[in-house]
């Protein structure tokens, strides 16, 4: 029984794990300035980072949470996931392997 590539139904693991994973990755990219500020603060503060980096941590959480709670952002990530899944069902090749360059012999 082959799976329909155009099927839009999502399993629980896709809704609860795979799409949120894409959301986290995209949100980190979009909040890159806050991620860099927090990372820099942590590196410079050592053991005291919990106390010294509260401002940077709050800014990062605020940025990420804004994306996590945005229904349009969820839909964008869901459509990206469905597109990847459809391509996998057509070709049988995972996205990661498709994006890798093929070795060339010369």
From Swiss-Prot:
Domain CHCH: 28-71
GO MF: metal ion binding
Keywords recorded for this protein, A-Z: Acetylation, Copper, Disulfide bond, Metal-binding, Mitochondrion
GO terms for cellular component: mitochondrial matrix; mitochondrion
Cysteines paired by S-S bonds: 31-63, 41-53
InterPro entries: Cyt_c_biogenesis_Cmc1-like
Subcellular locations according to the entry: Mitochondrion
Residues that bear N-acetylalanine: 2
Pfam families cross-referenced by the UniProt entry: Cmc1
Motif (Cx9C motif 1): 31-41
Protein's UniProt keywords contain Acetylation: yes
Motif (Cx9C motif 2): 53-63
Keyword Disulfide bond in annotation: yes
Subunit structure of this chain's protein: Component of the MITRAC (mitochondrial translation regulation assembly intermediate of cytochrome c oxidase complex) complex, the core components of this complex being COA3/MITRAC12 and COX14.
Job of this protein: Component of the MITRAC (mitochondrial translation regulation assembly intermediate of cytochrome c oxidase complex) complex, that regulates cytochrome c oxidase assembly.
Family, as annotated: Belongs to the CMC family.
Protein name: COX assembly mitochondrial protein homolog
Organism taxonomic ancestry: Eukaryota, Metazoa, Chordata, Craniata, Vertebrata
Gene name of the encoded protein: CMC1
């Amino acid at each position: 029984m082959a799976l329909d590539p155009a099927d839009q139904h999502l399993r629980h693991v896709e809704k609860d794990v795979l799409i949120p994973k894409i959301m986290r990755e995209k949100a980190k990219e979009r909040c890159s300035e806050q991620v860099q500020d927090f990372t820099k603060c942590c590196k410079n503060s050592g053991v005291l980072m919990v106390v010294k980096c509260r401002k940077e941590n709050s800014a990062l959480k605020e940025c990420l949470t804004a994306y996590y709670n945005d229904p349009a952002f969820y839909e964008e990530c869901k459509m990206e996931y469905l597109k990847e899944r459809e391509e996998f069902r057509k070709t049988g090749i995972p996205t990661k392997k498709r994006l890798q360059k093929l070795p060339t012999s010369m």
